[in-house]
Amino acid sequence: MRLVVCLVFLASFALVCQGQVYKGGYTRPIPRPPPFVRPLPGGPISPYNGCPVSCRGISFSQARSCCSRLGRCCHVGKGYSG
């Protein structure tokens, strides 16, 4: 009886070590934080999204990127919305 219990334990341990038991779980890798973005002229960079805090002095492509990725859109005379 002890031999059977020992063999069952070893077999289940081997399956866990090979990853056969938990096939349906969370398998995606943990995303890495975004790389450091150098500050651009026109205002400080927000540390969590890489978009300037103010709309002044940024290029059109950067403003469009911040708007499409984060919903932070620049409007003439109003600054960011969202």
UniProtKB/Swiss-Prot annotation:
Residues 1-19 form the signal peptide. It is found in: Cytoplasmic granule. The modification Serine amide is found at residue 81. Disulfide bonds join 51-66, 55-73, 67-74. Keywords: Amidation, Antibiotic, Antimicrobial, Chitin-binding, Disulfide bond, Fungicide, Pyrrolidone carboxylic acid, Signal. The modification Pyrrolidone carboxylic acid is found at residue 20. Its main location: cytoplasm. It comes from the Eukaryota. Coiled coil: none annotated. GO terms for molecular function: chitin binding. InterPro entries: Penaeidin. One of its GO terms (biological process) is killing of cells of another organism. GO terms for cellular component: cytoplasm. Belongs to the penaeidin family. Antibacterial and antifungal activity. Presents chitin-binding activity. This is Penaeidin-3g.
